[in-house]
């Protein structure tokens, strides 16, 4: 006899994510109806979190998806793919004014065919929520050549660059190198795969922006400042909604994530420098000694792992640098940015004449296209082979990172097999790498798209020279919303 109680659960006015979490827990354990009439309407200002409310529609969408999924699994356990889809759907609805405030990585068993095939074919039409997760196969040891070959072929066939590689064994090996960390853990990683994490643990990121004119001394100073910021952030462990294990793990390891972005903008930090390894070790030691000093001052444990390279997709746009360890995308390219149709800024951009279109995955979101020209002396991803990207990754893994360098290796059919051979031969050191075809991938409205100089000039002819910001909202809704990277559910992907 079914003993699941059916009842009306009335949702009160929303002011925090904690209530949303509690209500969704009720969704998982009971059969219910819901009334969202008292949820604040779409477009309302969020004074604490910042931005604009998305209204009740995303929450209702999640509830309906969950009920449909559970009804389809009546009498049995959910499959790994169904659990994956549910997590993706949760991530999909965590939005503020059309801007996602979630990031997700899904680590799956090597031999799980369902998740291996999750982004094959026209998945973006039938299962669009899957676009919210980075999918990686989780390896506990080096696989046989046959197993690896099957997975490598599947990655190529998907044209989505998935699944990526996450090796728990290599992560344990990397964690053990500095002698400060308990490496016998079932490590995972954060969504961008630059931080080695225990279960129930956070990353804590800060960043050095590398400029072309930087010297060893100026880089040392920047690393020192970024490390101080990270060490101060490591004291912030009052996670009121989460279980105590999150606080315990975070305080025990006091992890940092001191990153470098704009690496390829400075010749000192590229493979052109024959002393690159020793330079990176000097910078790493600067971070370690700075953290040791400030940890003592603050009365917290010395960090068990400090340095990494994060992808830095957002920060690099803000400061006009190359992204993390990657080259600039191309000499000329389109950079796409999303905005909710109810956001006043969306109307400002649209009225000014910035090219835009409806988001294929969200009718309430518009995608704006900005033509971009890279600096003359820039290193371009379009000019790098996959092997060149991997060789640079290996140097930073060895000489800079106590965590990992996050990298998306862009490949072409001409070097795909060579890359696979290198990956297999170096598998014991590869804690996590993702791959993506440079072109012909399955992602519509991708963030970056290479264009020709002629296409760039054509786009610039109709592009507005300036914006009338006086047309924008006059009230300040950003107070209290200054969320740091990867804190409070916001990951700057």
What residues fall within each predicted segment?
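Core structural elements
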Residues: 85-96, 231-236, 249-266, 309-315
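Internal maturation/activation junctions in enzymes
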Residues: 98-142, 237-243, 262-311
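Catalytic alpha/beta core of large soluble enzyme barrels
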Residues: 155-158, 164-167, 174-242, 252, ...
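Glycine- and acidic
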Residues: 1-9, 44-52, 67-77, 206-216, ...
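Flexible, glycine/charged-enriched surface loops at secondary-structure junctions
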Residues: 29-34, 73-85, 94-106, 234-248, ...
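Active-site cavity-forming subdomains of large catalytic enzyme subunits
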Residues: 1-214
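Short acidic, low-complexity intrinsically disordered linear motifs used
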Residues: 477-493
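Secondary-structure capping and boundary motifs in well-ordered enzyme cores
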Residues: 55-58, 82, 184, 194-201, ...
């Amino acid at each position: 006899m079914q003993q699941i109680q059916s009842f009306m659960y009335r949702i009160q006015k929303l002011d925090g994510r904690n209530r949303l979490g509690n209500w969704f827990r009720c969704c998982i354990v009971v059969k219910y109806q819901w009334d969202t009439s008292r949820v604040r309407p779409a477009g309302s200002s969020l004074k604490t979190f910042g931005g604009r409310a998305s209204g009740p529609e995303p929450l209702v969408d999640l509830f309906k998806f969950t009920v449909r999924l559970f009804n389809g699994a009546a009498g049995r356990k959910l499959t790994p793919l169904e659990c994956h889809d549910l997590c993706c759907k949760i991530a999909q609805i965590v939005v503020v004014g059309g801007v996602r405030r979630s990031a997700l990585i899904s680590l799956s068993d090597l031999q799980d065919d369902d998740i291996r095939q999750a982004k094959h074919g026209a998945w973006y039409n039938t299962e669009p929520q899957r676009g919210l997760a980075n999918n990686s196969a989780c390896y506990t040891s080096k696989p046989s050549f046959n197993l690896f070959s099957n997975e490598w072929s599947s990655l190529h066939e998907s044209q989505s660059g998935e699944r990526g590689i996450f090796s728990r064994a290599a992560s344990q090996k990397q964690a053990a190198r500095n002698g400060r960390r308990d490496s016998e853990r079932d490590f995972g990683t954060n969504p961008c795969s630059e931080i080695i994490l225990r279960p129930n643990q956070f990353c804590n990121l800060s960043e050095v922006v590398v400029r072309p004119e930087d010297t060893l001394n100026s880089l040392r100073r920047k690393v020192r400042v970024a490390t101080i910021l990270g060490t101060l952030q490591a004291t912030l462990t009052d996670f009121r909604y989460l279980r105590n294990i999150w606080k315990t793990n975070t305080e025990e390891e006091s992890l940092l994530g001191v990153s470098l972005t704009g690496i390829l903008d400075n010749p000192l930090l590229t493979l052109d420098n024959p002393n690159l390894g020793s330079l990176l070790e000097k910078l790493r030691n600067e971070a370690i000694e700075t953290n040791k000093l400030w940890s003592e001052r603050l009365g917290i444990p010395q960090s068990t792992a400090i340095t990494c390279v994060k992808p830095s997709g957002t920060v690099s746009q803000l400061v006009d640098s190359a992204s993390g360890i990657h080259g600039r995308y191309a000499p000329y390219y389109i950079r796409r940015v999303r905005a909710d149709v109810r956001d006043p800024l969306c109307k400002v951009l649209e009225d000014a004449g910035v090219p835009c279109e409806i988001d294929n995955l969200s009718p309430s979101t518009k995608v704006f296209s900005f033509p971009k020209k890279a600096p003359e002396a820039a290193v371009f991803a379009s000019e790098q082979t996959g092997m060149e990207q991997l060789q640079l990754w290996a140097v930073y893994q060895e000489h800079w990172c106590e965590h990992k360098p996050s990298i998306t290796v862009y490949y072409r059919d001409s070097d795909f097999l060579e890359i696979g051979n290198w990956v297999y031969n170096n598998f014991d050191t590869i804690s996590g790498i993702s791959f993506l075809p440079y072109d012909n991938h399955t992602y519509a409205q991708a963030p970056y798209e290479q264009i020709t100089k002629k296409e760039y000039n054509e786009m610039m002819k109709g592009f507005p020279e300036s914006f009338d910001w006086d047309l924008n909202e006059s009230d300040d809704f950003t107070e209290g919303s200054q969320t740091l990277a990867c804190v409070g559910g916001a990951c700057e992907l």
